[in-house]
Amino acid sequence: MLTRRSLMGSATALALFMGIAAPAFADPDAALAKLQETVLSKGPSGEDPSPASDVVLSDEELAKIKEMGATAAIVMHYGGNDWSQAQINGLQTQFGAMGIEVIAVTDAGFKPEKQVSDLETIMAQSPDIIVSIPTDPTATAAAYRAAHEAGAKLVFMDNVPTGFVPGTDYVSVVSADNYGNGVAAAHLMAKALGPDGGEIGLVFHAADFFVTKQRYDGFKATIASDYPNITIVDEQGIGGPDFSGDAEKAAGAMLTSNPNIKGIWAVWDVPAEGVMAAARANGRDDLIITTVDLGENVAISMAQGGFIKGLGAQRPYDAGVVEAKLAGYALLGKDAPDFVALPALPVSQDNLLDAWKQVYSTEATENVKASMQ
């Protein structure tokens, strides 16, 4: 699905609302360094973020949890990327340390009806805990409500079902600084374009999905407020489930309609792969691409000095660990913060291998290492 947005969007309005009278050039390197010291995102209902470092379980609390013999299910929106696998790895590792058995891991393929079915199937096993990310906050709300009313303790990644109240309907929500990662991708785009700037395009997620909208808003507001030498000339949305294929079509249309485009931002790594394919098909080896999420394919491109010049990375493994600990809070009856966020991680070729360790808690793959120039 392709949709096109007006080029005067909410992010420009946000920049004006924040009192930015006239854009002034930013120093991308200084802005990127400062970004890692704070969290810019708010929670789904406007909650202030709590730091992940505050979520801790004592040895005594861990011992109590182990005695419970609790079970958990992980209900994913989509399992086909490195981010999802890292979340699952973090969850399984921490649940194992807590003596909690993971009885199911599901992949909805970004289809709300499949996720509803997954939840119904899982509830037949009566898990004590469900950790999940809703594909659609409205379409899945009734299924999550039924799980909550049946006694499952809910911890969410990134997004929450419509009408759910923290501390009442669910334990907590954990997220990366998605607004901050959009900001990081904008500064990295500006750095790669250089002082002359130029025309760019955006490939956004055309869905009611809180975190991808935050990335879009962060990227667009930063370009509007900090880089008057950069002009967004085209935007197209993708709805999936073939996000790479949809992005290839969207980017191809952009490059045909706007031959002077120097760069394209993609909302996460899988669409960025489609943008790379479009660049190759259109003979645009000079195209600059920035994105969010450190997947292996975009990391290989970055390592090779290819299309991907920079990205804002989440910390999905660490997020999974925090989500499991928050589930432990619920088992203990311990008060949990409403919204926990991990700071953005700007990634370029210079820090790629170190960033991989931070994101995945493991060494970079051999494919990434072998691609480093």
Q: What feature does the model see in each segment?
A:
Residues R4-M8:
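N-terminal export leaders
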